[in-house]
Design a protein with these regions (language model features):
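Accessory cap/linker subdomain of secreted extracellular hydrolases
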Residues: 37-101, 289-387
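Primarily recognizes the serine-hydrolase "nucleophile elbow" in alpha/beta-hydrolase
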Residues: 238-309
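Short, surface-exposed "cap/lid" segments of acyl-processing enzymes
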Residues: 136-203, 215-217
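C-terminal catalytic histidine-bearing segment of alpha/beta-hydrolase fold enzymes
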Residues: 375-378, 393, 402-459
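Alpha/beta-hydrolase active-site loop
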Residues: 196-199, 223-245, 270
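Short beta-strand/loop motif that positions the catalytic acidic residue
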Residues: 388, 393-400
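Acidic catalytic loop of the alpha/beta-hydrolase fold
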Residues: 262, 295, 398-403, 432
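Catalytic-loop region of hydrolases
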Residues: 18-144, 150-155
Length: 459
């Protein structure tokens, strides 16, 4: 989640140029918190004293739960941890026959201009919400929802109207926290205002660009899962081209995302070559900042301190897609995971961070962040060696302690070594301030790509 911060405008801002060869940085010390060793005795005591929550059996035919390969107990737990329905069938209902629809194929469309326009502040011609086929993290059929915002007026620039893919940091566990919910239903307690703090949508619309905003956590609200997010974004681009072939079929697309939106953007560019190779000539670049590119770093920087609530929510979000993670929860964590907390937005689950609890308190195994399973998840979500087929602009706060800059620098090094034209900017600030200090240049860089200016390469 990005905090409240000041945006200084839509133009180039002074960034601190990174030298071509960045020295190997050390992981900065995390903020002060409770430094506890593994807690096997407390874990054992929790499971002895607290019974497991009573759970109804999972429906065998539920694609949301996908219980076929799970034990009955784990299937029941997974079913109980899924996000609550929000009373909007467009969002809640799993479409029939998804296996027969190609990724990016449209399954439903609705016009939400009447409710969306007041929330967008700037004038718009139309806002469409697309429901389309995508794949989950295991390449099984799923569905995605994306909102396409079309500006007023004709496009007067060269070629077709460009599209900005604005990957917001949704950072949430409930479906009503998605940007599509606010656009379809108006402002609510669940609305995420990050899109106004970093006003990419508004600036792009005033520029004459269309804007695509994806609910990139998927129907399971798999917060922090980059493969789900990457697939959802790539298939959203396919869906737009399928829905409006005459207006946007030959358009260029450019991506931008910060923090949780950078997780999604990173997933999209790293998976593009293998999942949607035809988009390599359609997407002209991606700008990403505050990049949680390596979760093994966050295991040190966000555990047992004020960020622990967000970190626990991210682990839980990944567990929704990877139930082997859910199987490592102790009884206390299971009670929390099946409670109303499992469908909340970030302003709720950040609060437990004041307790500065280590993740060990929720696990049923010692050293859960150094387990074989943890290292497997780190490797899968890091997507080592996958090359972006499009140019990259990467930035990170040099004083960052929640999401250490070493992760972004390593991503930059990796992509440079793979031959990707890339730029890295080390900007002033920790996570919240750096969102503002790095934003103007990243948006200017993306604008230049959409205008057809060749991407610089500072590798």
């Amino acid at each position: 989640m990005i905090g409240w911060c000041t945006i200084v405008g839509y133009g180039a801002a002074p960034g601190f140029a990174q030298p071509p060869h960045i020295g190997a940085p050390a992981i900065p010390p995390g903020p002060p918190g409770i430094a506890l060793p593994s807690l096997p005795d407390i874990q054992h005591w929790i499971d002895e004293v607290i019974p497991a929550p009573p759970l109804a059996p999972a429906h065998a035919d539920s694609p949301l739960v996908d219980a076929a390969q799970l034990t009955p107990d784990l299937a029941a737990l997974r079913a109980a941890t899924m996000p609550a329905a929000i009373g909007d069938s467009f969002v809640d209902d799993w479409p029939d026959g998804l296996d027969d629809v190609a990724p990016g194929g449209i399954v439903a469309v609705r016009d939400v201009t009447a409710t969306a326009a007041p929330t967008l502040i700037v004038p718009v011609r139309q806002v469409l919400q697309l429901k389309y086929r995508t794949d989950d993290s295991h390449d099984e059929s799923s569905y995605g929802i994306a909102s396409l915002v079309l500006p007023v007026g004709d496009w007067t620039g060269p070629g077709e109207r460009p599209v900005v893919v604005n990957n917001l940091p949704i950072d949430a566990l409930g479906r009503d926290c998605n940007p599509s919910y606010t656009l379809a239903h108006g402002f609510s307690r669940a609305s995420n205002f990050t899109g106004y703090i970093l006003p990419t949508t508004q600036l792009a619309l005033l520029r004459g660009y269309a804007v695509l905003i994806t609910d990139h956590e998927g129907p399971r609200m798999a917060y922090a899962e980059p493969i789900v997010a990457g697939h959802a974004i790539l298939d959203a681009i396919r869906a737009v081209r399928n829905q409006l072939p005459d207006e946007l079929g030959d358009s260029k697309f450019g991506m931008i995302g910060y923090s949780g939106g950078a997780i999604a953007t990173n997933g999209a560019v790293k998976l593009m070559s293998e999942y949607a190779p035809e988009l390599s000539d359609v997407v002209v670049g991606a700008a990403l900042g505050g990049v949680p590119a390596d979760f093994s770093l966050l295991a040190h920087s966000m555990n047992a301190n004020l960020a622990s609530g967000v970190f626990l929510a991210a682990v839980f979000g990944i567990g929704r897609e990877r139930p082997e993670v859910l199987a490592r929860m102790n009884h206390l964590a299971q009670w929390v995971a099946v409670s109303v907390l499992n469908s909340q937005c970030s302003e709720v689950f950040t609060v437990p961070g004041v307790l500065q609890l280590p993740i060990d308190i929720a696990a049923n195994t010692p050293d859960p962040l150094d387990s074989d399973l943890a290292h497997e998840i780190y490797s899968i979500t890091r997507m080592d060696g996958k090359k972006s087929p499009v140019p990259l602009f990467i930035f990170n706060g040099e004083q960052e302690f929640w999401v250490p800059a070493v992760g972004a620098k390593n991503l930059y090094r990796e992509q440079c070594a793979l031959g990707v034209p890339a730029v890295y900017r080390s900007v002033f600030g920790e996570h919240f301030i750096a969102a503002a200090t790095g934003y103007p240049e990243s948006l200017s860089w993306l604008d230049q790509r959409l205008q057809g200016v060749p991407a610089p390469n500072e590798c």
